[in-house]
Amino acid sequence: MTSLNGRHAEKTIDMPKPSAPKVHVQRSVSRDTIAIHFSASGEEEEEEEEEFRGYLEEGLDDQSIVTGLEAKEDLYLESQGGHDPAGPVSTAPADGLSVSESPAILPVSENTVKLLESPAPALQVLSPVPLALSPGSSSSGPLASSPSVSSLSEQKTSSSSPLSSPSKSPVLSSSASSSALSSAKPFMSLVKSLSTEVEPKESPHPPRHRHLMKTLVKSLSTDTSRQESDTVSYKPPDSKLNLHLFKQFTQPRNTGGDSKTAPSSPLTSPSDTRSFFKVPEMEAKIEDTKRRLSEVIYEPFQLLSKIIGEESGSHRPKALSASASELSSLSGLNGHLESNNYSIKEEEGDSEGEGYGSDSNTSRSDHLKPTEDASKEVEPKGSQASSLKDLGLKTSSLVLEKCSLSALVSKEDEEFCELYTEDFELETEGEGRLDKTLDLPLKPEVLASDGVALESEDEEDSATEHQELPVKTLGFFIMCVYAYLILPLPYYMSGLFLGVGLGFMTAVCMIWFFTPPSAHKHHKSLKALRHQSTRSLDIKEPEILKGWMNEIYNYDPETYHATLTHSVFVRLEGGTLRLSKPNKNISRRASYNETKPEVTYISQKIYDLSDSKIYLVPKSLARKRIWNKKYPICIELGRQDDFMSKAQSDKEATEEKPPPEKELPSEDLKKPPQPQEGTKSSQRDPILYLFGRTGREKEEWFRRFILASRLKSELRKPAGVSGSKSGLLPAHSRHSSPSGHLSHSRSSSKGSVEEMMSQPKQKELVGSVRQKMLLDYSVYMGRCVPQDNRSPHRSPVQSAESSPTASKKLPEAPPSEEEEQEAWVNALLGRIFWDFLGEKYWSDVVSKKIQMKLSKIKLPYFMNELTLTELDMGVAVPKILQAFKPYVDHQGLWIDLEMSYNGSFLMTLETKMNLTKLGKEPLVEALKVGEIGKEGCRPRAYCLADSDEESSSAGSSEEDDPPEPTAGDKQPLPGAEGYVGGHRTSKIMRFVDKITKSKYFQKATETEFIKKKIEEVSNTPLLLTVEVQECRGTLAVNIPPPPTDRIWYGFRKPPYVELKARPKLGEREVTLVHVTEWIEKKLEQELQKVFVMPNMDDVYIPIMHSAMDPRSTSCLLKEPPVETSDQL
């Protein structure tokens, strides 16, 4: 504790005031609170102090200055020298601040008060402070001058007594309770000086208001440190508040009532019972303190209510920091905080924040009553509310466990500026924001999935079955029985109770014996089943299905060939089919990872599929060929008169504009007009023939065409003919384009407003029709498929450039999956296929299947047919390394299996080159091939349609794409290439034919030497031994939605295959590396064409029913327009 005499203060009045770091320790007007002011510059504060002194000049009496520092504060003031505004620079060397465990008792004069500190529970280590420090750290330098005088010249009356030992460092007590310092300026100025750099940026405030805000916050910061020693809640009575207070309390108080200093922070020390004033005087001073407290806190509460009204709509993303709430809590005004944890850190919703919110409410309720007596007029604080910011965004993690002064000094100016401008509104909003922060982690738990919710319901049902015994009821009955046996009841009463009890027990026994014991359980199971049945898979089919297909104008099985088709981009939206023709054809076969075609569209046709007939051609297709991509889907369009006539009226104006496809930006270029094509199509295209690029894609298109053809008839039943309401036009505009009219004005066959308004109804109700068909299927599959893997990202991704099954995302494998989980499947398959690998019967069956495939491979006409001479199916079957969880989407059930094969499958193929056929007519040889196949002159495609014979392989020359003609080239006439499906030989074979038909070659073959050599070569067999040593990849198994009888399988990406090809020429083995590598590469390409997605192979299952199955009672056969059973 330091005290300064008046002479020393008088001596220092005339000293200059340089700008230097300084500390002011100042007493308030009410003599209840001190404030410590630390300033690094000391310039801006002086002007403000002079302004503030003008407000304090009224009603000030002679007051003594008792200057001191809080005992519990860690005073780490690091200024290197400076002057007090009212005192000279200290010159005595500072040895550091000594720590005293005993109360610091210093000599005092008549106008000086003693301050006794209670013994410290723990020593607070203080860092040494240089002597060059401003007052408070030096013995000779004055600490502060009193602001209670009217001017600097009047400071003689508020004298400062010197220290008891001027030559020594000040002795600071390390007590846990804070000292009652007798200056109103110091601590008030501390925060103010730290915030002055930020304040000039904001709108200026009245001096009184600014002093009030700063003083309140700084006093709060000081008061919170007092509770360090109060580890338990302790609230001393008013009679005990006379401890450690000053005699100056007895001086007359100001009558102006404009004290804007901080409220009282009375010091209490339970361990010290000594008093330095009389009780009556203390009681009078307590009343004065209460009055001033009510005056001080009334205006902040009014400001708080105003801020809440203005800032109610503001957004604060972060919760309060703990220290901000504690410092802003009005409980600090009375000095009764019950918490000793003070820290400034970011709130993460921990338990620390819950306590301070409750403390704030408790202490605030205690101080609401004195505010009712306040009569201060509240000044407008609109400018204050406009400068508020979010405190949580910049609150640092500085720990202020003991509210050390060093921590306050090290804080940024901006942080304290925000603190004192937001302390009042944060007080009431902090608790609410904290609760919101704590509730955030609980929200995901509420949003549970359907499967989890149902499981919780089942758990609740099972819990009800195992309820606790009705203890109260049983106790009541036991008491009744006990009373019946003990109490002396009359005989008639006893007989009545006995009869009632026996009747009740008889009824219970009757119910027990004659009621089935499982009735209740059955009821529970039905309830659980009903809950489970309502859980269906969220299968969402895309509203728009688009992809590439092949179209032919007229289909005749006898003359059809793949080269007669042309590519079209198909877009199916509701019941509208849009066909866009590119300027050049793309590949007729979809392949893995194919590039996006760069095409422009030259024409477009739009059809309405309502009431159309969808079926497959040719008639009587064999079951195994239903989804063969070589056979088209036939769409016999319904009545298109109104539809096409409306399109024709708009065709001339929109012929050259492309379809609205986002994927193809180049479609706006090079669109030559073809005005006569639309007219011909309206008369010539009542039937469309479309080929799928893969078998799986063909089945998908067929199913969607069926749904589209029945869409309008389904809509007419519930909705009538109300599809052309004008109110539906905006909805359609959102689906198609910003302007519904522009979206269709670009098309070449459709542009009428009536048709645009009729389509939205189809779009809105298309989901209901699909849901009607898939309802039971979805519920059934919902019980079979794990619910946690039905997310949309697992679904196959539709590719507009290739097909709906062009590219699919592989589900990620859970890391916990291990091979042991599939061990039972591998063991079962291995045991079942034991006989398959070892018995000759099954080897012959497989050989026959392979031979049928080989017989359909198109070879040059001078080579004989491929034959299988050797087959070794190895010693193992494919093994499932990992099975991914199944999932269901709009294309059906998907199961992904990680497969591996190491069985050394081996087969040997043989053929011969018949060079004697060179130079002869290929057509004659083709006819001979027809005789060998016992097909006569019937085209191969027509003969195979209704037979179980294998069709040509995927790599046959029939499917090879010859050089595509441009848009202006004429398509070849049907049948121009002969009976063999219009097959055209390759360039190499045509070149060979030219050579063999030349006169020179014919003359050379007539010589005996060459004839002999040709016969030797023709009789030499060509052998090719192929061994599959290893195959590993992810196999996707797909079962489409019902009705279907197919299981489709294919690899997600090209598998790793290790092939060994060993060609032989007679008895010689060809060892040329280039030859063997070329053969192996061709075999891998052949495998990729058949088994790599989007190409998938299929297996039909007899127990499943397809749409063309006469046994089927599926919804696709109920509609009369779809006469697939009659056609097939």
UniProtKB/Swiss-Prot annotation:
Transmembrane segments: 473-493, 495-515
Sugar attachment sites: N593
Keyword match Oxidoreductase: no
GO molecular function: lipid binding
Bias (Low complexity) ranges: 130-186, 736-751
Subcellular location per the Swiss-Prot or TrEMBL entry: Endoplasmic reticulum membrane; Nucleus membrane
InterPro entries: SMP_LBD
Alphabetical UniProt keywords: Endoplasmic reticulum, Glycoprotein, Lipid transport, Lipid-binding, Membrane, Nucleus, Phosphoprotein, Transmembrane, Transmembrane helix, Transport
Superkingdom of the organism of origin: Eukaryota
Residues annotated as domain SMP-LTD: 817-1102
Signal peptide annotation: none
Membrane-topology annotation of the record: Multi-pass membrane protein
Biased composition regions of type Acidic residues, renumbered to the chain: 946-963
Ranges of compositional bias, category Polar residues: 248-274, 796-806
Amino acid composition bias (Basic and acidic residues), ranges on this chain: 364-380, 645-671
In-chain residues carrying the UniProt-annotated modification Phosphoserine: S195, S264, S265, S269, S294, S733, S739, S745, S749, S752, S799, S816
Region (Disordered): 1-28, 71-99, 130-279, 345-387, 645-688, 716-765, 787-821, 945-981
Annotated GO biological process: lipid transport
The protein's role, per its UniProt record: During endoplasmic reticulum (ER) stress or when cellular ceramide levels increase, may induce contacts between the ER and medial-Golgi complex to facilitate non-vesicular transport of ceramides from the ER to the Golgi complex where they are converted to complex sphingolipids, preventing toxic ceramide accumulation.
Domain notes: The SMP-LTD domain is a barrel-like domain that can bind various types of glycerophospholipids in its interior and mediate their transfer between two adjacent bilayers.
The protein, known as: Testis-expressed protein 2
Organism: Mus musculus
